[in-house]
Regions:
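Conserved acidic residues
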Residues: 90, 222, 463-465
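An N-terminal boundary/leader segment
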Residues: 2-111, 135, 340-351, 406, ...
């Protein structure tokens, strides 16, 4: 885990010492508690019944904070300890040196003015490609942008702060959002090292929002935000058995992120439950003057997405299964679980339409990766220049994709050429330019494959509310990403004990499939139908209870709130 500087490390250490003294003073001065000993015992009893920090929800934490059972300071101290205990996973890249002072201020505000809402005092982690105006860096995991400060903060981070959320730190990621090379392991960055998955030793976390997913799985924060161009939220959510939500493009502002494609990038959430994702979305969605895509939100007021997360009835909902969009081995554990999931949805009252296929799926599958990447490469080439124009104190004078390539080649920390730059090099290929005819042809192809040739073709033909596919793989998520449609991944199951271990092809050959590793189910719908998506996902989650029944992360941190709170009271 990296701290921004020695002086900032001392500030954090000083803050911890200050809080230890403050806790001792509170213990010696009983009138500061404003409760009788009997009341304190009642509160402690309630706290002991609270789930582990690896399982507790945002809603539960908010309730305990409002009841006075715990404070935000307690939460920050506990999460910092857990982050230290889980350092081998390299999920958290950088701690906010001001986290404890922010927690004190939020606790005081709660006492004096009441709560701002469900996120008041809740510590969250932010992916290291999202700009924050504080003492945290934003570098996409690369030393090239270390010290390059954003002029303005991401609108999403600002709205989360306004809701009372506490930015605990930055998470590790696949460098440059996994837009560097073809032989670079997911979850690796020069600054953060190799993030590891939570469910099996030396396993891949997938990416690029790797640290955000692993942190939530291990209980290193209450929730986290990540970004997705294609599968960068959904895959790490799947491999770490958490909920990954990629909202509709334009529902959540995307300014202040280090881009791959401003046309396709979306900020989303990694949470323990679907309802937690809804709480986060309530405080992220909305119009921003800095993101013109949000100006086209089709409703005057942002819905209360939490209201969609209730009950177990799906009567009136039609769910389609596009079988031609994913591999179908009926004996695989994923497919066995998927077929059971379809029965669960039907038992809840949903009408399940099988073989609601994408009209042009076979044609789309024939396109090779580089042809598909022409659009992303062209947009990265343009959009990274735009982003770099918004930073100050740019110590390495990085102004364009060419500068990133040269920096990567020159600096040994970037581990070139062992870790290649194949995707970067696509930006230098002929015709890779947003003004080129080839680019515009590919954009039109994407609209067809995602629209009438894909998702819209299937949904309109069969009058569907939602599509459902197994795992985060297949072409469904790819087409949804190209169209800006919302997608949510929910835990579906775990590989059985007799599963043969499979490794990644690229070094360091992390474990990809193994006994007890998780997989997910994915729901897709049309733009700005996020509420329907959350409703279906919440019902499935409630009926299946996959994480309650299944294996747990193999090496969870040990610090818990109840222990820290009792220790504090005994100082």
């Amino acid at each position: 885990m990296e701290f921004p500087s020695t002086s900032l490390f001392h500030r954090l250490l000083g803050g911890i010492m200050c809080l230890v003294m403050l806790s001792a003073f509170q213990s010696a001065s009983s009138h500061l508690w404003r409760r009788s000993p009997q009341e304190i015992n009642v509160k402690r009893s309630g706290l002991r019944n609270m789930p582990s920090l690896a399982n507790v929800t945002v809603e539960q934490l908010s309730r305990h904070l409002n009841a006075g059972d715990i404070t935000s300071v307690d939460l920050v101290r506990a999460y910092i300890s857990r982050i230290e205990e889980a350092s081998e996973f390299k999920a958290v890249l950088q701690l906010n040196p001001d986290a404890l002072s922010l927690a004190l201020a939020l606790d005081q505000e709660r006492r004096e003015k009441g709560s701002r809402g469900p996120l008041h005092g809740i510590p969250i982690l932010v992916k290291d490609n999202i700009a924050t105006k504080d003492n945290l860096d934003v570098s996409a995991g690369s030393y090239a942008l270390l010290g390059a400060k954003p002029i303005v903060e991401s609108s999403v981070v600002s709205t989360l702060r306004a809701a009372g959320a506490l930015i605990l730190g930055k998470t590790n990621l696949s460098e440059w959002g996994n837009f560097r090379g073809l032989n670079v392991s997911a979850g690796w960055s020069p600054r953060g090292g190799q993030t590891l998955g939570a469910y099996y030793p030396n396993s891949t976390p997938e990416g690029s929002s790797s640290g955000s997913a692993v942190a939530v799985a291990l209980g290193l924060s209450a929730a986290a935000i990540g970004t997705e161009t294609f599968n960068s939220i959904l895959e790490p959510a799947e491999f770490n058995s958490v909920v990954g939500l990629k909202p509709s493009r334009g529902l959540v502002p995307n300014d202040g992120t280090i881009p791959i494609s401003s046309r396709q990038d979306v900020i989303g959430t990694l949470t323990r439950t679907v309802k937690d994702a809804a709480y986060m979305l309530n405080n992220m969605a909305g119009r921003s003057e800095r993101d013109e895509r949000t100006w086209n939100i089709p409703f005057k007021e942002i819905p209360n997405f939490v209201k969609f997360c209730s009950g177990t009835d799906l009567s009136g909902v039609t769910v389609g299964v596009p079988r031609n969009s994913f591999p179908a081995d009926p004996t695989s554990p994923i497919m066995v679980s998927f077929e059971a999931a379809l029965r669960t949805l039907a038992s809840a009252g949903a009408q399940v339409i099988d073989n609601a296929d994408f009209p042009a799926a076979d044609e789309f599958k024939k396109l090779n990766q580089q042809v598909k990447g022409i659009v992303r490469s062209s947009e990265f080439k343009r959009d990274i220049v735009r982003y770099l124009s918004t930073v100050e104190n740019n110590p390495h004078d990085i102004r364009a994709a060419e500068d990133i390539i040269e920096f990567t080649k020159r600096h040994k920390e970037e581990e070139y050429p062992n870790r290649d730059i194949g995707k970067f090099l696509w930006t230098q290929a002929e015709g890779v330019d947003v003004e080129s005819e080839k680019y515009n042809e590919m954009v039109e192809q994407e609209r067809f494959f995602g629209g009438e040739g894909g998702i819209l073709g299937a949904m309109d033909k069969y009058n569907l509310d939602v599509l459902v596919v197994p795992s985060s793989f297949g072409i469904g998520n790819d087409l949804a990403a190209k169209m800006g449609f919302p997608v949510i991944g929910v835990p579906l199951g775990f590989y059985p004990e007799n599963t043969a271990i499979q490794l990644e092809d690229c070094e360091p050959h992390l474990v990809r499939i193994a006994p007890g590793m998780p997989y997910s189910i994915t729901f897709i719908t049309k733009a700005f139908s996020d509420g329907v998506l959350l409703r279906v996902a919440h019902v499935f989650e409630n009926l299946s209870k996959v994480n309650e029944k299944g294996p747990k992360p193999f090496n969870l941190p040990v610090t818990e709130l109840s222990k820290r709170s009792e220790d504090k009271n005994n100082l």
